[in-house]
Design a protein with these regions (language model features):
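Short secondary-structure boundary/capping segments
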Residues: 15-16, 61, 140, 146-147, ...
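Short acidic capping loops at alpha-helix termini that bridge into adjacent secondary structure
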Residues: 67, 107, 152, 170-171, ...
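Arg/Lys-rich RNA-binding interfaces used to dock onto structured RNA substrates
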Residues: 59, 71-77
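Terminal amphipathic alpha-helical/low-complexity segments used for targeting or macromolecular assembly
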Residues: 1-67, 124-127, 195-214
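Flexible, glycine/small-residue-enriched loop-and-beta-strand segment within the central core
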Residues: 75-85, 90-166, 193-194, 200-210
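Short, T/G/N/S-enriched strand-turn elements that build extracellular solenoid repeat scaffolds
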Residues: 61, 83-85, 184
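C-terminal/domain-terminus segments
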Residues: 162-191, 195
Length: 214
């Protein structure tokens, strides 16, 4: 079976390897063109006034899967087409999504300023990580990526970084400045570096129980 798997991987394109979490060549022509196009479109989006209807056209060209979401901008996607954003979800200023593997954001997700979703992974040993020249002289390196999933009805506060391979369950609140390196179960309040669950979110947190806020 292992030999069969190796043969399958050999027949995969570099894009297929990348979104499957396999080691891939980031200097691949198709991937380079996709990134350059996404970066160009992000630059276009970021200079448009937030009232300009052209922003919607730019996001459509970027290939983000989903509708009825709002990105305040500036934004930066590595590809865009490997990201799915649910209904009524929102990202505040300076949203970064390095979507080398699929990024899935659920419905009604609030993301504060400077949120970063980072799927790329690099080898730990520098001997495996450093750049090298291919036979044609092009510089490349060995990279892989892990997907990120954020469930429905989450609040990801400002300056949060979510690392590759993480799933955040429905109804979670991730405190400001957290670095999320492991899965967070549904309906959790989690915070810290690395991010840890502080407690569950319960009916006691209902605004009805906090009249002092009104």
């Amino acid at each position: 079976e292992r030999l069969t798997d190796v043969r399958k991987e050999d027949k995969m394109t570099e894009k297929e390897k990348m979104i499957s979490g396999k080691i891939y060549d980031p200097s691949d022509k198709e991937l380079t063109q996709l990134r350059q196009n996404a970066h160009r479109l992000c630059t276009e989006y970021n200079v448009l006034p937030e009232t300009d209807e052209k922003r919607g056209e730019v996001l459509k060209s970027l290939g983000i899967n989903g509708s009825a979401f709002y990105l305040q901008g500036p934004v930066q996607f590595d590809y865009g087409c490997f990201t799915t954003i649910g209904v009524n979800s929102y990202a505040n200023f300076n949203f970064t999504c390095v979507d080398c593997c699929p990024v899935t954001i659920g419905d009604n997700v609030f993301m504060g300023p400077n949120v970063s979703l980072l799927t790329p992974m690099h080898p730990l040993r520098w001997q495996d990580r450093n750049q090298y020249a291919k036979p044609d002289g092009t510089m490349t390196d060995k990279e892989y990526a892990k997907p990120i999933t954020i469930g429905n009805n989450c609040w990801i506060a400002g300056n949060v970084t979510v690392c590759g391979g993480v799933t955040i369950g429905d109804g979670c609140v991730i405190g400001a400045g957290s670095v999320v390196t492991r899965d967070i179960p549904p309906n959790s309040l989690a915070v810290g570096v690395p991010c840890r669950v502080i407690r569950g979110i319960t009916e006691a947190d209902s605004l009805e129980n906090h009249p002092e806020l009104f």
